[in-house]
């Protein structure tokens, strides 16, 4: 059969295509792939793409990291003679698409004991099942665990149960990976220690950047290439996309903060902002930062041709999706879950929407929700040594649902204090008795003038041996 793999433009989608395409290639099948353009097509299947696939005479379309909610699109594929296998990990709606097979760990009739796999985790289960069916050796699917691990950690799924095993074993393979593209992007990220943090903060942003700012094809080609020069060029391109993403994000963030301060938006229960020329690919990241900074739900909209398209982020205890459901008469389209949403609205309805959303937040008594810091233990600086910090690594890999241990330190004296990165971050040295440690507070630079050398403070933080290059 002539096969095409239809994936998403994020790291989970890219790694899903990589694993399935590579596995099929080893079986003698040259499957092609299709990744939608984030800005022009959006997430998931769309009918024009399905019609293009049919026109190119594909017999079988396999979706990865998408498809579970694409009822109409798969119905159209059937009409055009393209058979479909859906593999996905997103929540299942009231009905399933009419596909040959629908593989989703969140199916209500699913007997598999773990529901929290990433999209690439579901693909891994598919190639594992195929390997068993074809009497292949275990190594024929286990060899892809390095790529599966990258997608799993990057998609911020809970790193518990099978995801913990995938990540733990996968990171071991990552350290000795034969994948030239993965080796190259790891080197470009500048991390000496290859752990979940290096993947989350070094590798994932670079792989995601091309999908946000251009087209995700380049990240996929990086994983599939065996050509040294091509890998070098693709890595350089991803680095350029990442720098562009950072600059664009900084511009939107500064613009958003200016709006908040000029219009006293932070006095509202929720922060809803709109801007011309805001890049749709990065406003979700900025919304996360606004929510983190003000501890309020935020929705950012980029305006174009009388339409606002945007992303929202919430705080624990406030269901953003439920709140939007109560305002849906003013919206063209919305989707997502309790903590993160996507939204489309006519520009003329934005002010009315802001008022309605504010009323919903008032009814939910959102002002009574306070930020909570979960502390694992209270310790002294004298308890810290290299062996103690290294012993925490037994709890790795850290990530969603398995956070780094958080410690409380009481009564520390500030020995030095300054801002870093143009006032963005806070750098301190802290003293207790004769013990001194250095500390960094990411995105806490605004506190630099609130404290001075000699002040006594309580600090909540995490411990690590600084290995960043």
Predicted regions and their residues:
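Hydrophobic helix-and-loop "lid/oligomerization" segment in the mid-to-C-terminal part
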Residues: 1-60, 80, 131-355, 374, ...
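Short alpha-helices
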Residues: 19, 96-136, 141-153
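A residue-level signal for conserved active-site and pocket-lining positions in enzyme catalytic cores
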Residues: 62, 208, 392, 461
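Histidine/acidic-residue-rich, glycine-tolerant segments that coordinate divalent metal ions
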Residues: 64-117
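A common structural junction motif
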Residues: 328-332, 359-366
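Accessory interdomain/linker segments of ATP-dependent helicases and helicase-like nucleic-acid enzymes
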Residues: 379-437
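Beta-strand/loop nucleic-acid-binding surfaces
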Residues: 434-451
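Flexible glycine-rich surface loops and low-complexity tracts that mediate binding to linear polymers
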Residues: 454-468
